A protein has these predicted regions:
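Generic structural signal for small/hydrophobic residues in well-ordered secondary structure
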Residues: 6-7, 44, 82, 114
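A generic structural signal for short hydrophobic patches within well-formed alpha-helices
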Residues: 10, 41-44, 128-129
Length: 151
């Protein structure tokens, strides 16, 4: 199984030592099968408001995945499909796209691109429960999923 970490997992680790320890423990055993979404990179970079924070995110978060060639980006088809998913949610729930839930735009893109790569997203974000019925084949899990043992 392959994994990607959602933005909220990193934010929790930045803010709380116990969450950081849990993330590091997971990565210690799962780094070879863990990937970074380019969409998550964009969200984390946008949240790094100081030069030092930007450097820390680049060196401590992005570079380990980049060095291993473990960054994936949504395809053109993923952008189109995620747009259709958002339109469906907006119509069902009767909300205005950019004012009601702007983070859902990226969440839909993350869901579709994870599905494209056959990657399970680790997240605490409840929006993925709403999105998963609309993105067939997308899988997500709460932190921290059990790892398969040796065969």
């Amino acid at each position: 199984m392959k994994y990607a970490l959602d933005t909220n997992i990193f934010i929790d680790a930045f803010r709380d030592r116990a969450a950081e320890a849990a993330l590091l423990a997971f990565l210690e055993r799962a780094l070879p099968v863990t990937f970074m979404s380019a969409v998550v990179m964009q969200e984390l970079a946008a949240g790094a408001r100081t030069t030092q924070a930007a450097r820390d995110v680049q060196q401590g978060v992005f570079e380990p995945f980049e060095r291993r060639g473990r960054v994936f980006a949504p395809s053109t088809a993923a952008f189109a499909e995620s747009g259709r998913v958002i339109a469906t949610v907006a119509a069902r729930e009767g909300w205005q796209l950019l004012t009601e839930n702007p983070s859902l735009l990226n969440d839909a893109l993350i869901a579709v691109s994870c599905r494209e790569q056959d990657i399970t997203l680790i997240t605490r974000d409840g929006d993925f429960k709403r999105l998963s019925p609309l993105v067939r084949g997308f899988h997500y899990a709460a932190p921290w999923p059990p790892m398969a043992g040796p065969a």
